[in-house]
């Protein structure tokens, strides 16, 4: 079997390609830019093309897998269809792979997927269960974004964008939260809730639907779900109640869980913030229903120390801590900055790169209220990702909204100018956070360069 991946350099596509190589398939693929992920695939025997051309679809290719970002008029996709190749989108292909595993776990939600998938993977890996893992970030424990296991356990992120996760075949599904996002595809929150409801209905009756019971939209996704529903959260009506929350001197969470009247004891985390207590609680419940004993879960959850671009320490400038975070939704920004505030630094700087024009425009009001915990805010240009500039939204619009809300915010276009400004103004004991799903991390890297 010869499989070609259009957009093979993506975090999920590269992971699927690696799984196929491990299964003994011939793998080729194309992407627009070089990356370390492509180098890794080359080392494993994949044929990689830079640039997407119809000639890349050779006669011996049997199947072509493509991402949601690939346009219908893509040269390779058109050529594959003209040559009558088997064509499958990424999510459908991943769903087919999931069928091969007895215990497949899908982690979904508007935000927190990568952190929670990584937490859950850490619990399973250190329990010697040898899971196959697909994660949307760089998890040091597995040396990247994918690990090929030799067991019936499969752990993956599940994204709602373009209803991708409706192609999956999970036995356990987690929903961390349900909020407005991806409004270039969904018409609004009602359509998003309907999608998550369909996701829940994918589960078999013997499966588990583990959901954040404190989320205001969660009850609207439960209609006709056949699996066992486990709600977790701080509200006493939940099945798994999070209690006695506090933080150590480093800002790491400590909490207890009471499940169906039984005290599961105290859990200690090695990551920051209330949001990670919620993430961890879902991972704990998924591990518990998978048959992992409580003490193993308790020990292993503390081992997890984060994943790349999730409150990742990049180093220091002078004596100021420099951190990078993937936060690109208002709720994520609030959670990240709230966790940062607990570290009690002198001045909290946030350098934010908005991600996509659609998200920035549709959530402009929410973004304008997401930075209150920050003392100084720098906004740079919107990262387009898959979109074209519609001309009706600009980062300066966000800066103006922040100014109206009495947030100390400025706009700086170029990364180099941001770094120069920071070097001139950051003081000892400050905390600098770069935030966004685009390449804003480069500002942090440049700032800490010697």
From Swiss-Prot:
Pfam families: Mur_ligase, Mur_ligase_C, Mur_ligase_M. ATP binds at residues 109-115. Transmembrane segments: none annotated. The keyword rRNA-binding does not apply. The keyword Transmembrane does not apply. Keywords: ATP-binding, Cell cycle, Cell division, Cell shape, Cell wall biogenesis/degradation, Cytoplasm, Ligase, Nucleotide-binding, Peptidoglycan synthesis. Pathway: Cell wall biogenesis; peptidoglycan biosynthesis. InterPro entries: Mur-like_cat_sf, Mur_ligase_C, Mur_ligase_C_dom_sf, Mur_ligase_cen, Mur_ligase_N, MurCDEF_pg_biosynth, UDP-N-AcMur_Ala_ligase_MurC. It is an enzyme of class 6 (ligase). Cell wall formation. HAMAP family: MurC. Belongs to the MurCDEF family. This is UDP-N-acetylmuramate--L-alanine ligase. It comes from Clostridioides difficile (strain 630) (Peptoclostridium difficile). The gene is murC.
């Amino acid at each position: 079997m010869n499989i070609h991946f259009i957009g093979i350099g993506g975090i999920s596509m590269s992971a699927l390609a690696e799984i196929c190589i491990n299964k003994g398939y011939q793998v080729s693929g194309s992407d627009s830019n070089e990356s370390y992920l492509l180098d890794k695939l080359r080392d494993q025997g994949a044929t990689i093309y830079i640039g997407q051309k119809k000639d890349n679809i050779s006669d011996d290719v049997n199947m072509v897998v493509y991402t949601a970002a690939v346009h219908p008029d893509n040269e390779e996709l058109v050529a594959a269809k003209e040559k009558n190749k088997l064509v499958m989108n990424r999510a459908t292909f991943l769903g087919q792979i999931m069928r091969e595993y007895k215990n497949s776990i899908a982690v979904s939600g508007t935000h927190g997927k990568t952190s929670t998938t990584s937490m859950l993977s850490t619990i399973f890996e250190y329990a010697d269960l040898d899971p196959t893992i697909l994660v949307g970030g760089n998890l040091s424990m597995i040396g990247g974004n994918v690990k090929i296991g030799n067991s019936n356990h499969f752990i993956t992120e599940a994204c709602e964008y373009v209803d991708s996760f409706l192609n999956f075949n999970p036995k356990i599904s987690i929903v961390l939260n349900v909020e407005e996002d991806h409004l270039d595809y969904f018409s609004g929150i009602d359509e998003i809730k309907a999608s998550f409801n369909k996701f829940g209905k994918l589960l078999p009756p013997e499966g588990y639907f583990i959901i954040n019971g404190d989320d205001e939209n969660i009850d609207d996704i439960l209609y006709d779900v056949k699996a066992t529903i486990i709600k977790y959260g701080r509200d006493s009506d939940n099945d798994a109640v999070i209690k006695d929350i506090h933080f150590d001197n480093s800002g790491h969470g400590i909490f207890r869980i009471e499940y169906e009247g039984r005290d599961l004891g105290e859990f200690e985390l090695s990551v920051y913030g209330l949001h990670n207590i919620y993430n961890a609680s879902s991972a704990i419940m998924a591990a518990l229903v998978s048959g992992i004993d409580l003490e193993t879960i308790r020990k292993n959850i503390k081992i997890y120390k984060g994943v790349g671009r999730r409150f990742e320490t990049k180093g220091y400038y002078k004596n100021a801590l420099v951190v990078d975070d993937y936060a690109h939704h208002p709720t994520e920004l609030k959670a990240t900055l709230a966790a940062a505030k607990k570290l009690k630094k002198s001045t909290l700087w946030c350098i934010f790169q908005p991600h996509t024009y659609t998200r920035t425009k549709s959530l402009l009001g929410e973004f304008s209220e997401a930075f209150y915990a920050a003392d100084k805010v720098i906004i740079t240009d919107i990262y387009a990702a898959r979109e074209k500039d519609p001309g009706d939204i600009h980062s300066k619009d966000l800066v103006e909204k922040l100014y109206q809300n009495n947030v100390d915010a400025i706009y700086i276009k170029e990364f180099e100018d941001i770094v120069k400004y920071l070097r001139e103004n950051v003081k000892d004991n400050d905390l600098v956070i770069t935030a966004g799903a685009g390449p804003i991390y480069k500002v942090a890297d440049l700032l800490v360069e010697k």
